[in-house]
Regions:
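TRNA-recognition modules of translation machinery and tRNA-sensing kinases, especially anticodon-binding
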Residues: 130-424
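N-terminal alpha-helical targeting/anchoring segments
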Residues: 1-135, 149, 153, 157
Length: 424
């Protein structure tokens, strides 16, 4: 959530940055926010004046009582009662105005960084670099959904029977490959200085609002209405919320956490070839990395996180590319995002496997996650997160790119985790 003072002091800049994200109602909402804030300030000023007057009268009453002037004191007490009623009404009005401001601010996306490329569609994203050689597959090579059936790795139909489409059942070496990737990704993260946490996979409404999933992605989340809980779309939500309503020491920064969780997304409106097999699921496994940093260090941390994920893809020997997302392709909460995509040899297209983002103070303002500097003053920290990595499309590309007439070869770095070198 954008900070109210920042909006007041930088209205034109805020509108300019929001236009990069193609936020249509920006001017209407921002003008209304400023109008309400003016009302808030006026109401607050009136309330403070009444409190000051009531305090002065209370002092007078004490002096009158000491002087034995009870009748005059009673007159002043009547004034005090009237002032308290006015104060109560102003407090209620103030709460209503503040709630209206909050509800409007919740609709406003984060302002993109000045480093964000201009554009409205994925075609406008900026290519940062591409790594690796796209493999040339032997004749008769097939996409991963055929490979998983051929080698009895994943049963999509059984998942439909048990739950529905988008909930695959991993079996045999398919399940072992899944577990191997999870352990490998977690080991890499802890080696890089991230503390592993195992958070809940359901969160309350406050947590979903704090990281920006609500109200932006309400239709994409599974909502457990009986208990009013949400299945998490990413471990970012519970891990980042560890620091909700927390004041850190500057020496605590940066905080680096990682965690593995199943993730759940409704993916409403997704159809066609792009959702076949592992390309888009309702339940999938992912390792997330999260950092809470000093504002001066967050973009340095973003580059480190992007390079860290790229390093894993290099070890997996997967051709990949890094994109800097344009304003129109960015998420609601992000200030700057890198997407990392791997090459799918059988599908002949790029598959997104990671998004690494800096949210600056957008999440921490909602979280009320602050730190106290050496001067004793508190300020909002910056938050960042990234997928490191999401498993489904990694598995898809590993199976497709490494298929041979003899079977599917396992990357060397994974063999100690899988216990086998080939799937045949």
């Amino acid at each position: 959530m954008l900070q109210l003072n920042y909006i007041r002091e930088n209205k034109e800049e805020v509108l300019k940055r929001l236009a990069i994200k193609s936020f249509k109602d920006a001017e209407t909402i921002i003008d209304k926010v400023i109008e309400l804030d003016n009302s808030r300030r006026a109401t607050q000023k009136d309330g403070d004046a009444i409190k000051a007057e009531a305090n002065a009268i209370a002092k007078q009453i004490g002096e009158l009582m000491k002087a034995g002037k009870k009748e005059a004191a009673e007159i002043q007490k009547a004034k005090t009662a009237e002032l308290k009623l006015r104060e109560k009404n102003l407090d209620e009005a103030l709460k209503g105005i503040e709630e209206d401001i909050k509800n409007l601010l919740l609709q406003v996306p984060n302002t993109p960084s000045a480093k964000v490329p201009l554009g409205k569609t994925p075609e406008d994203n900026e290519l940062v670099f591409e790594h690796g050689t796209k493999p040339t597959l032997a004749q008769g090579s097939v996409p991963h959904w055929d490979l998983t059936t051929k080698y009895n790795l994943i049963d999509f139909e059984l998942g439909v029977k048990l739950t529905g489409a988008g909930f695959p059942v991993y079996k045999g070496k398919g399940a072992r490959l899944q577990r191997a990737l999870i352990n490998y990704f977690l080991d890499k993260a802890t080696e890089a200085g991230y503390m592993e946490v195992q958070p809940p996979i359901m969160v309350n409404e406050d947590s979903a609002y704090a990281t920006g999933q609500l109200p932006d992605k309400e239709g994409q989340m599974y909502h457990m209405t009986v208990d009013d809980l949400y299945l998490i779309p990413t471990a970012e939500v519970p891990i980042t919320n560890i620091y909700r309503d927390v004041i850190l020491k500057e020496s605590d920064l940066p905080i680096k956490n990682c965690g593995y969780t199943p993730c759940f997304r409704r993916e409403a409106g997704s159809y066609g070839k792009d959702v076949r097999g592992l390309n888009r699921l309702h339940q999938f496994d992912k390792i997330e990395i999260v950092q809470i940093t000093h504002p001066d260090k967050s973009y340095e941390a973003l580059e480190q996180m992007k390079d860290y994920v790229a390093g894993i893809l290099k070890e997996l020997e997967l051709p990949f590319r890094v994109l800097k997302l344009c304003g129109g392709d960015m998420s609601f909460a992000s200030a700057l995002t890198y997407d990392l995509e791997v090459w799918s040899a059988a599908q002949q297209r790029w598959l997104e496997v990671s998004s690494v983002s800096n949210f600056e103070t957008f999440q921490t303002n909602r979280l009320k996650c602050r730190f106290k500097g050496a001067d004793g003053k508190t300020q909002l920290a910056h938050s960042l997160n990234g997928s490191a990595l999401a498993l489904p499309r990694i598995v898809a590309s590993l199976l497709e790119n490494n298929q041979t007439p003899e079977g599917i070869k396992i990357p060397k770095v994974l063999v100690p985790y899988t216990g086998f070198e080939i799937i045949n």
